[in-house]
């Protein structure tokens, strides 16, 4: 069994407990009362390279990263530094996240918020919307094609922007066929946890120009952002280097400044 399979088994077990506590109808009622979702595609398009900043306590590959007693405060620092989107881990067993983290971040910041989890059912999409998310992660490797297509369609129908994660060229083809408008290329293989920094450079050319391209994993500073930008990235997702650093606001500001450099102003209308 791969690491991804183990994570999803845990996700399904935790999901069953939440479904027993909160009905789908109740979630839909909460979602209807949530403030309208912000446009995730619009947040990631435009001149330069946008920065998605992550609230992340731990990971399967590195273990504990940061305690993050105040996720809302961290998110506020990210926003003040110029982040375009805040990513919030809500998977509990391996990443130490929760829907409570999503609630607190949503209440604190005005920019779009991404629920980052292992989504396998539409119930989780309604959860995301009920807790104020504007974007949601869908991992191609975790889903059969009919499920991927259905989840993208359902997410968009309730206002969520799917960030569809891929790891190789075959998964890009699946994501494009499923109608993805934003594709994230993760340099970390979730089945083995190995990182290949060349993944984005190899995979990005297969992504059509009209789709927003996000580089995930391996961003430690402005030099990495610039490298990804030169390979065609419209945005980067940054987590570990921010939560383990001493001054996340300044670190984000430095990344944003690099992304706004005139040499990188390759935005599309």
Curated annotation (Swiss-Prot):
CDD domains: IGPS
SUPFAM superfamilies: Ribulose-phoshate binding barrel (SSF51366)
Pathway(s) it belongs to: Amino-acid biosynthesis; L-tryptophan biosynthesis; L-tryptophan from chorismate: step 4/5
E.C. no: 4.1.1.48
GO biological process: one example: L-tryptophan biosynthetic process
GO function term, MF aspect, one: indole-3-glycerol-phosphate synthase activity
Pfam families: IGPS
Keywords: Amino-acid biosynthesis, Aromatic amino acid biosynthesis, Decarboxylase, Lyase, Tryptophan biosynthesis
Catalysed reactions, as listed in the record: 1-(2-carboxyphenylamino)-1-deoxy-D-ribulose 5-phosphate + H(+) = (1S,2R)-1-C-(indol-3-yl)glycerol 3-phosphate + CO2 + H2O
Keyword Lyase assigned: yes
Keyword Repeat: no
Transmembrane segments: none
InterPro entries (UniProt xref): Aldolase_TIM (IPR013785), Indole-3-glycerol_P_synth (IPR045186), Indole-3-glycerol_P_synth_dom (IPR013798), Indole-3-GlycerolPSynthase_CS (IPR001468), RibuloseP-bd_barrel (IPR011060)
Gene3D superfamilies: Aldolase class I (3.20.20.70)
Family: Belongs to the TrpC family.
Protein known as: Indole-3-glycerol phosphate synthase 1
The species this protein was found in: Streptomyces coelicolor (strain ATCC BAA-471 / A3(2) / M145)
Name of the gene encoding the protein in the UniProt record: trpC1
